[in-house]
Design a protein with these regions (language model features):
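Acidic catalytic/metal-coordinating carboxylates
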Residues: 34-35, 61-64
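Two-component/phosphorelay signaling modules centered on CheY-like receiver
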Residues: 13-31
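The feature encodes the CheY-like receiver
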Residues: 16, 58, 86
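Alpha4 helix (beta4-alpha4-beta5 surface) of REC/receiver domains from two-component response regulators
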Residues: 64, 85-100
Length: 122
């Protein structure tokens, strides 16, 4: 499997470590940050293939950030992982360029399925 570059953006450090540890085992190249400001810097420098993005971060909403990322870097795939899962949230996610939506709490098999879908989507 070719190693894919994944950026994890979540303010919950335990979730970041959990995702990183499990993704590293599956040969993904990962790193994580805890704010949108840090995420923007890494995206500008390294252009990850996939962004695993929480919606509620200390410096803003992931949905708003996703819209900007998709405008500037349309090739970046975005998987939103959030505890806020209402029909309105899913509609907003779809409109803002989210490629896949996962509700917290989640299982790693959901994350692996999401990555498989967005990476292999034609």
């Amino acid at each position: 499997m070719e190693m894919e570059n994944v950026l994890i953006v979540d303010d919950e450090v335990d979730i970041c470590y959990f995702l990183k540890r499990n993704l590293d085992r599956k040969e993904y190249t990962t790193c994580f940050v805890n704010s949108l400001k840090e995420a923007q810097k890494l995206i500008d420098e390294d252009r990850p293939l996939v962004l695993l993005l929480d919606n509620h971060l200390p410096d803003g909403l992931g949905l708003d950030f996703a819209e900007k990322v998709k405008r500037d870097y349309p090739e970046v795939k975005i998987v939103m992982i959030t505890a806020h899962d209402t029909p309105k949230d899913r509609i907003s996610a779809n409109r803002n360029g989210i490629d896949y939506f996962i509700s917290k709490p989640f299982m790693m098999k959901e994350v692996f399925r999401a990555l498989d879908v967005v990476i292999n989507r034609a």
